[in-house]
């Protein structure tokens, strides 16, 4: 079974995949947002390519656990993604995922400019790895 991780941003959408047997997530690509229909189509193409059986969308909660506008955006997007993909979609707390993604990319020696094109997909991998780790026995 493969799972798709989604870091939903206002400008870009990061995507990652995980093989649940290996229990590791990896960044795949970043989709530059256009219309929602185009966004869903681009995500669905990646989902088909990787034969995913479920998706996990990051839920950007505030540090105190409350939901702001970005969390409401993710909550609204998740059911539409589920319909577009035809697989179950779950939400997962993504607090500090972008910070962790930037830290990982810096550790690999990437400059801030080089990180720009990769941070969203890496954040999706962070979200998905957190989801996998939470499910571990």
UniProtKB/Swiss-Prot annotation:
Is-annotated flag, keyword Hydrolase?
A: yes
Task: Name the Gene Ontology molecular function terms of this record.
Answer: nuclease activity
Q: Which GO terms describe its cellular component?
A: cytosol
Q: Which GO terms describe its biological process?
A: rRNA 5'-end processing
Q: Known EC number(s)?
A: 3.1.-.-
Specify the domain of life of the species encoding this protein: Bacteria
Q: Where in the cell is it found?
A: Cytoplasm
What UniProt keywords are attached to this protein's entry? Cytoplasm, Hydrolase, Nuclease, Ribosome biogenesis
Q: Which residues form the signal peptide?
A: none
Q: What is its main location?
A: cytoplasm
**SMART domains in the cross-refs:** YqgFc
Looking up Gene3D superfamilies in the UniProt record yields: YqgF/RNase H-like domain
The family database entries (Pfam families) matched by this protein are listed as: RuvX (PF03652)
Q: Its function?
A: Could be a nuclease involved in processing of the 5'-end of pre-16S rRNA.
NCBIfam families according to UniProt: RNAse_H_YqgF (TIGR00250)
**Family, similarity comment:** Belongs to the YqgF nuclease family.
Q: Under what name is this protein listed?
A: Putative pre-16S rRNA nuclease
User: Which species is listed as the source?
Assistant: Anaeromyxobacter sp. (strain K)
Lineage, please? Bacteria, Pseudomonadati, Myxococcota, Myxococcia, Myxococcales
């Amino acid at each position: 079974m493969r799972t798709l991780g989604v870091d939903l941003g206002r400008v870009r959408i990061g995507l990652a995949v995980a093989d649940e047997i290996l229990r590791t997530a990896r960044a795949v690509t970043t989709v530059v947002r256009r219309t929602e229909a185009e966004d869903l189509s681009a995500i669905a193409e990646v989902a088909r390519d990787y034969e995913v059986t479920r998706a996990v969308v990051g839920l950007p909660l505030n540090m105190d656990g409350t939901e702001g506008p970005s969390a409401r955006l993710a909550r609204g997007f998740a059911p539409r993604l589920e319909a577009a993909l035809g697989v179950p979609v779950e939400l997962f707390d993504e607090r500090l995922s972008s910070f962790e993604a930037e830290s990982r990319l810096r550790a690999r020696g990437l400059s801030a400019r080089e990180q720009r094109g990769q941070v969203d997909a890496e954040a999706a991998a962070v979200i998905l790895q957190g989801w996998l780790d939470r499910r571990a026995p």
